[in-house]
């Protein structure tokens, strides 16, 4: 197939995009049919290269700072034109997709990419509607040109790459970035700004539905288990990462999944394993000589990924949405071994732990975080993606929980019996047992034990889970060491929470010294 060197491929199929990616040398086929690509020196998001255009219509509503960095509007216009001109002189790919599955809340997006594989990624992760933009809404544009190199002195960027969101112009500019997760998270940030205006809570969470129509939400940062735990063969998946919660509905913002692949196994993650097939994109996964993926090989990164459409998941919500959640689960990966496998939260505790967003950076998705594992706090369990002040999202969460009567739980997928390096991590079957008990309603009205210092209430028994695991102090050989670790963790919580201006009731719902 011969093409002009500046040919534009518009809305071609996933199979054609795979073919083009191979033809252009962008990737190779794995034995399981997936397209395998490498993203170069950036194998995760680059928070220092993310900006929001500072302009009059939105600047008063954005929480400016290290996460939401301001970018001048005139510099944006100049850089957009420069990148567009560069891209128009080469082959590129255009697809028309939706971001948001609910009719009232979708955004129509024209997605232009310099590479076939990143267009395929967008096609698989966003929503391919049967009819594009039926409501005739104003269109957003993504311009993603991986082979454009920014010049900071000229362009006003931080490095050779950038991600810039312009709300007034409805544009997202991504230049010099081969890691495709930037595109997904940029549009998530856009919806995270827009949805609260409609009284909808945008959430960094996974969601699934039981046979009776009961919905569970799984909040958590990367590596805490959102994708793995929501991919449950006994339930129907809504989505693994980004959702909106409005009156009467939980809807997926996306149309696909972006699963971590490190140490992936068919035994522990059968749903994800089966979804890796022709049309799936594997980022930074190492292949052996027979082109079989070696998911245990982290020589490129711990943050290897699979991007696949929800159609590759057998049990899924056909409409990409469900009702309001019966159970809201905050997943935390506790490195200290202090937190119990499950705690039952009241509304004030829910607000406290939602604002805190405590977890560990495990196989981090961010560049520059290093290979080390460390504790962190990420407001709303996704601080890098929420442009408005945290209180906006916390108030919406409590409003929704109160209105529907959702039950809230804190689930530790991290360490027990000691901290990292001493204790051991909860295995996936144990955590699945906790989740199953929550979803069955077994913990509603359960008899609890109060844990001082960390100020949490734990059930005295959980069906299918060893009772001696429930109070973490019992799992430590040295009880004094546990008490000291608990005080250390409580201090981390208290120091982190000092920045929030909230009621005394919420402040007092957290750990106490």
From Swiss-Prot:
Signal peptide: none annotated. It comes from the Bacteria. PROSITE patterns: PEPCK_ATP (PS00532). One of its GO terms (molecular function) is phosphoenolpyruvate carboxykinase (ATP) activity. The keyword Cytoplasm applies. Keywords: ATP-binding, Cytoplasm, Decarboxylase, Gluconeogenesis, Lyase, Manganese, Metal-binding, Nucleotide-binding. It is found in: Cytoplasm. ATP binds at residues 185, 204, 220-228, 269, 305, 431. Pathway: Carbohydrate biosynthesis; gluconeogenesis. It catalyses: oxaloacetate + ATP = phosphoenolpyruvate + ADP + CO2. Its cofactor is Mn(2+). Its EC number is 4.1.1.49. It holds the Pfam family PEPCK_ATP. GO terms for cellular component: cytosol. Coiled coil: none annotated. Binds 1 Mn(2+) ion per subunit. Involved in the gluconeogenesis. Catalyzes the conversion of oxaloacetate (OAA) to phosphoenolpyruvate (PEP) through direct phosphoryl transfer between the nucleoside triphosphate and OAA. Belongs to the phosphoenolpyruvate carboxykinase (ATP) family. HAMAP family: PEPCK_ATP. This is Phosphoenolpyruvate carboxykinase (ATP). It comes from Ectopseudomonas mendocina (strain ymp) (Pseudomonas mendocina). The lineage of its organism: Bacteria, Pseudomonadati, Pseudomonadota, Gammaproteobacteria, Pseudomonadales.
């Amino acid at each position: 197939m011969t093409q002009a060197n500046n040919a534009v491929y518009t809305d071609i199929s996933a199979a054609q995009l795979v073919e083009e990616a191979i033809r252009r040398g962008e990737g190779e086929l794995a034995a399981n049919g997936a397209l395998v690509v490498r993203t170069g020196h950036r194998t995760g998001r680059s928070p220092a290269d993310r900006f929001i255009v500072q302009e009059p219509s939105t600047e008063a509503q954005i929480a400016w700072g290290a996460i939401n960095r301001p970018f001048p509007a005139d510099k944006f216009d100049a850089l957009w034109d420069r990148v567009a001109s560069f891209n128009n002189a080469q082959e590129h790919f255009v697809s028309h997709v939706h971001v948001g599955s609910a009719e009232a809340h979708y955004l129509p997006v024209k997605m232009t990419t310099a590479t076939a594989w990143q267009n395929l990624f967008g096609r698989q992760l966003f929503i391919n509607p049967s009819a594009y933009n039926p409501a005739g809404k104003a269109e957003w544009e993504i311009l993603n040109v991986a082979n454009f190199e920014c010049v900071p002195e000229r362009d006003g960027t931080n490095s050779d790459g950038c991600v810039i969101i312009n709300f007034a112009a409805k544009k997202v500019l991504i230049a010099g970035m081969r890691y495709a997760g930037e595109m997904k998270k940029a549009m998530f940030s856009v919806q995270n700004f827009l949805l609260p205006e409609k009284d909808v809570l945008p959430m960094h969470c996974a969601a699934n539905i039981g046979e009776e129509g009961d919905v569970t939400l799984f909040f958590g940062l990367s590596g805490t288990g959102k994708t793995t735990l929501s991919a449950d063969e006994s339930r129907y998946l809504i989505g693994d990462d980004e959702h909106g919660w409005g009156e009467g509905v939980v809807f997926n913002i996306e149309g696909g999944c972006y699963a971590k692949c490190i140490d992936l196994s068919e035994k522990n993650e059968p749903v994800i394993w089966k979804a890796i097939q022709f049309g799936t994109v594997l980022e930074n996964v190492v292949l052996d000589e027979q082109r079989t993926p070696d998911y245990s090989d982290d020589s490129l990164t711990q943050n290897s990924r699979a991007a696949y459409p929800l159609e590759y998941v057998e049990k899924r919500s056909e409409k990409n949405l469900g009702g309001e959640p019966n159970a809201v689960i905050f997943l935390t990966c506790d490195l200290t071994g202090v937190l119990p496998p499950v705690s039952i939260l009241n509304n004030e505790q829910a607000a406290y732990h939602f604002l805190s967003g405590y977890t560990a950076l495990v196989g981090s998705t961010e560049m520059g975080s290093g290979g080390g594992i460390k504790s962190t706090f990420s407001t709303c369990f996704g601080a890098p993606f929420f442009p408005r002040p945290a209180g906006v999202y916390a108030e919406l969460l409590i409003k929704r929980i109160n209105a529907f009567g959702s039950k809230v739980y804190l689930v530790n997928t991290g360490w027990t019996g000691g901290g990292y390096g001493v204790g051991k991590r909860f295995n996936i079957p144990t955590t699945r047992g906790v989740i199953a008990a929550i979803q069955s309603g077994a913990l509603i009205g359960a008899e609890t034990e109060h844990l001082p210092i960390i100020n949490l209430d734990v059930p005295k028994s959980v069906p299918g889970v060893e009772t001696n695991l429930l109070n973490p102090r019992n799992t430590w050989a040295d009880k004094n060491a546990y008490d000291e670790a608990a005080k250390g963790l409580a201090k981390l919580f208290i120091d982190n929470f000092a920045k929030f201006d909230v009621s005394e009731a919420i402040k007092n719902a957290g750990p106490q010294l």
